């Protein structure tokens, strides 16, 4: 569930993410949580989604995202390799992707219509060699574009089996 809280910690709203998936015909993704052969985990009967990040679209950036409005939420659901943006007032999913992600985290609105995502790109070897490591993936929903921002051809690969956070530095680099 997503909880919206006030500045004084009062609960303003509760949103059931499974309801959002069902209302938008995205519930088919939940089947991935029950396919342990695709990952090294047991089938899930609890925490089938593993919601790991929510990022609201700030009003200052909203004009750069033609499909979205200020206050729309970017949501990452790791267990089913899904990122989507939805209107929390109506429950309408405006965009979603699961490709090219594997157990991702941390979608952030970057500006110029791009959403940056920390893609664990997890594989069963737990060393990252099979799929060439983790990545920072940028997607531009209104053009259906995908760009691997990091690693670059000039950088070393990196890998994190679980979790993960990214942020662009003021000079444009990514740690």
Where do the model's predicted regions map?
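Histidine-/acidic-rich catalytic cores in large beta-rich domains
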Residues: 1-175
